[in-house]
């Protein structure tokens, strides 16, 4: 079997993880305690669940995942939540002291104490796999644990499991909404690590998803639960082809092969369509062409950047439900004729499509309406560099005054690491600029 391990780090990683496992359980007919819903699997392929779940001798399903945090608050929520009996107690790992929004605490001082325990649990999970395909890593880069401990874990996974794919779902700071003053520092330091130690990183940002919830689902004040359930739908769509049958299934390494033209250019935009509320669903039915167009709308993007201001290098469309290959071909052909959707001239085709017959599942009493067909798009666009430029500007404003730097140095970090990480970000911005430039000749050897 081609198993995938999920690692959820820090508050954002764990809360997104909760929403994902809630959805996977519904999709695979698994109760909150890991038992199987009777008669559910008769109509589905029986071992679909084993990519993400292992099976105990008593027939209980256990998620192949680890939840990791430096303080116990969010892990306690999982331990006392609806799915408390789903996870093995050893999969929920927490320390006693939090990272206090400080990358250096997560990476050097507090993180060092917990990393060996985490790697030991991961090793046990890996030993329980017959053919590990790779890791999914969930974290945010604004806080201390997600950025610091997240980077440390990625570095160690590269050492221990060098050849395995690492796919990151990374929450970046929002342009307007900030949860910590030092977010720009943490983000730049963590991206420096993501560049080297992930193969594909899907960039998410709370503000963009917040606006989708307000606009498309008519939720006046979206909560993290609303946001995370929407993120879970994207992650479920990306991983559906690892778990269910379809006409064109997409493997984790295929994402890499099709989306990443140069190793460093691996930060992806994602979108989902249709996102419709329960009251709208009764009056509307969306065709394959309509949902494909909707996925390319700037408003549908799960990160704050405008793809019309950049060029696409590659694009993965994962369709679910009642979708025929000929409709997909027609929709993609129509997209290619649109002037607003520009591809770089050295990559004229740029589309990878997957079709999965499992229709989208929604959480009962949730905000999303059940639909017959949906599409999730993961695209590699030069527009994503807007996210980095924004963070770099904020970093420069603070770092020019050396504001807050003593908190990092006090935790054993060298000040030179700030400069090194910032230079790497400047190089990344330049890489994106070169890739989007008109001619292939301008692309230098700096990518290799």
From Swiss-Prot:
Protein origin, superkingdom: Eukaryota
Family: Belongs to the tubulin family.
Coiled-coil residues: none
Biological process, per Gene Ontology: microtubule-based process
Cofactor: Mg(2+)
Catalytic activity reported: GTP + H2O = GDP + phosphate + H(+)
Protein species of origin: Guillardia theta
Gene (UniProt): tubA
Cited SUPFAM superfamilies: Tubulin C-terminal domain-like (SSF55307), Tubulin nucleotide-binding domain-like (SSF52490)
CDD domains: alpha_tubulin (cd02186)
Enzyme Commission no: 3.6.5.-
Protein name: Tubulin alpha chain, nucleomorph
Function statement: Tubulin is the major constituent of microtubules, a cylinder consisting of laterally associated linear protofilaments composed of alpha- and beta-tubulin heterodimers. Microtubules grow by the addition of GTP-tubulin dimers to the microtubule end, where a stabilizing cap forms. Below the cap, tubulin dimers are in GDP-bound state, owing to GTPase activity of alpha-tubulin.
